From Swiss-Prot:
It comes from Salmonella typhi. The gene is yceF. SUPFAM superfamilies: ITPase-like (SSF52972). This is 7-methyl-GTP pyrophosphatase. Keywords: Cytoplasm, Hydrolase, Nucleotide metabolism. It comes from the Bacteria.
Length: 194
């Protein structure tokens, strides 16, 4: 049976994949993540997830390689990682009372057979109306500077929301496990008996 590789160095994706109790290794993909001119969010995450998985095929020639990529969209614009507290406050003020959509691209590449499975999972975050003081307090407490959308749903960020809508809550953290389990079963790797 091919071994499993996660084409990511994200500690959040690693922690999610560990839930499936299948042995795996992590490896850093070498992919230019620059969007193509006019590329829609769904196409971008799909292309990058596929590129990440396939970029490791030469290093791991008999493996199942998982690639994943995620972007955050607010008012039709891709929202990146804020990197500064001021930008985090601006992003959260813009998200206040709005719906932020996350698109997570997922690819599973069998490097032995060349078989590729892909999917894009959307996930909507409905923000409640936030006061300036709440935004300041949140940024000070959680420091979400390296999180798209300026929040951590697995932490205190949950206090910012009115509701969440999506097929799989893991999608919001960066790895849609329900879709991944379906893909793995198609490759004869069932997490329940692996």
């Amino acid at each position: 049976m091919p071994r499993l590789i996660l084409a990511s160095t994200s500690p959040w994706r690693r922690a999610l994949l560990e839930k499936l109790t299948i042995p795996f290794e992590c490896a850093a993909p070498d992919v230019d993540e620059t969007p193509m001119p006019g590329e829609a969010p769904r196409q971008l995450v799909l292309r990058l997830a596929q590129a990440k998985a396939q970029s490791l095929a030469a290093r791991f020639p008999n493996h199942l390689i998982i690639g994943s990529d995620q972007i955050c969209v607010l008012d039709g614009e891709i929202t990146g990682k804020p990197l500064t507290e001021e930008k985090a406050r601006q992003q959260l003020a813009k998200a206040s009372g709005s719906i932020v959509t996350f698109y997570t691209g997922l690819a599973l590449y069998n490097s032995a057979s060349g078989h590729l499975q892909t999917e894009v999972e959307p996930f909507d975050v409905h923000f409640r109306h936030l006061s300036e003081a709440e935004i300041d307090d949140y940024v000070r407490k959680e420091h979400p500077l390296h999180c798209a959308g300026s929040f951590k749903s697995e932490g205190l960020g949950i206090a910012l929301f009115e509701r969440l809508e999506g097929r799989d809550p893991n999608t919001l953290i960066g790895l849609p496990l329900i879709a991944l389990c379906q893909m793995l079963r198609r490759e004869e790797m069932n997490p329940l008996n692996a």
